[in-house]
C-alpha cells in the first residue's frame, strides 16, 4: 500500500505526558472468563496468581473480573481517551496473558499509525528551520540578488 493510502498523523503526546507528571493511559481492565471451560484455564490461573501483582504495580488501573458462562475468555481495556481494546485470551498460558496485559497497560489507546514527522513543537520558530546558510552573508560570489549585480556592459554603436 502506498504512503497516501495509509493513515498518518503528526507526532503528539497524549495529554502532554512527560510535562509535569506521568499519567498512565489505561483506565480499566475487565476480564470475562468461564469457571469451568478448558479454554479459560490460563485466564483463571492468571486471575488467581498474577492479577494482584499487576494491581500493585499499576495502582491507577481498575481491574474487574466477571466470571460468566462464556465460551471465549477475553480482556477489555479502556483508556482515558475513550478507546476500547478487546483481546481474546482463548487457550493462552499465564505468561502470554501477563505479557498481553502489560502491553495493554503500556499503550496509550491510540491506533498504531505512520508518523509524518519525527519531531513536533507547539510553538514553531518564526525564523524557519535552520540550514547551513542561515547566518552567512549573501554578498558571496553568486549569492547576490540580480538587481545588485553589475549589469553586463552594453556596446555603444560607433558614431
UniProtKB/Swiss-Prot annotation:
Gene3D superfamilies, A to Z: Glutaredoxin
Subcellular location: Mitochondrion
Gene Ontology MF terms: structural constituent of ribosome
InterPro entries assigned: Ribosomal_mL43 (IPR039927), Ribosomal_mL43/mS25/NADH_DH (IPR007741), Thioredoxin-like_sf (IPR036249)
Region Disordered, annotated ranges: 123-159
A single GO cellular-component term on record: mitochondrial large ribosomal subunit
Family: Belongs to the mitochondrion-specific ribosomal protein mL43 family.
Cystine crosslinks: none
Superkingdom classification of source: Eukaryota
Keywords annotated in UniProt: Mitochondrion, Ribonucleoprotein, Ribosomal protein, Transit peptide
Summary of subunit composition and partner proteins: Component of the mitochondrial ribosome large subunit (39S) which comprises a 16S rRNA and about 50 distinct proteins.
This protein's name: Large ribosomal subunit protein mL43
Any one biological process term the GO annotation gives: mitochondrial translation
SMART domains: L51_S25_CI-B8
